[in-house]
Amino acid sequence: MFLADGAGSVSQGGEGATLAVNEAMAYMSQKVQGGELGLNDILATDIVLTVRQRLFAEAEAKELAVRDFACTFLGLISSANGTLIMQIGDGGVVVDFGHGLQLPLTPMVGEYANMTHFITDEDAVSRLETFTSTERVHKVAAFTDGIQRLALNMLDNSPHVPFFTPFFIGLAAATQEQLDLLPKLLKQFLSSPAVNERTDDDKTLALALWLP
């Protein structure tokens, strides 16, 4: 699972986010086909370098600065062999290894309160934060900063459990037909007045369960 959120202050932030996610997915597809993966910092760094290479190439092709494609970047890879989480920027990845929801990596903030870091930054690789576990994740919810105030208890950056619980209950109980409707229902929820009263930013939420 990969998420990216384009910087609102640049001209190609949305395209940068799309390119980042697509490149990460393509890279992982190749790695999976190639055999067993090591879920470690090396893999996370390789993914970030690959994404950066794609963004730099796109910027050069369009004769733009790479900062015009600035975006945050979050990723989670989990298998029976373990779990790897990676992050550059704000937003978060909430997981449950069977012991309750937790936020292994804290959303990044920049020099000022409303700033963060981007995968296009010169120091992005050194800013990259990772979390590894030998356990397979049971539940995961990844989100961009647009719903950070809904998803987290801001005092201690812990998951706001009542926000996530209905989603996971719905996922676990859904039929295939209902699963096909969930993206539309999720979009309606994220666009609802109740949510928009709490945030005026773009909102992305990705959910997954490991089914027995």
What is each model feature region?
Residues 1-212:
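PP2C/PPM-type serine/threonine phosphatase catalytic domain
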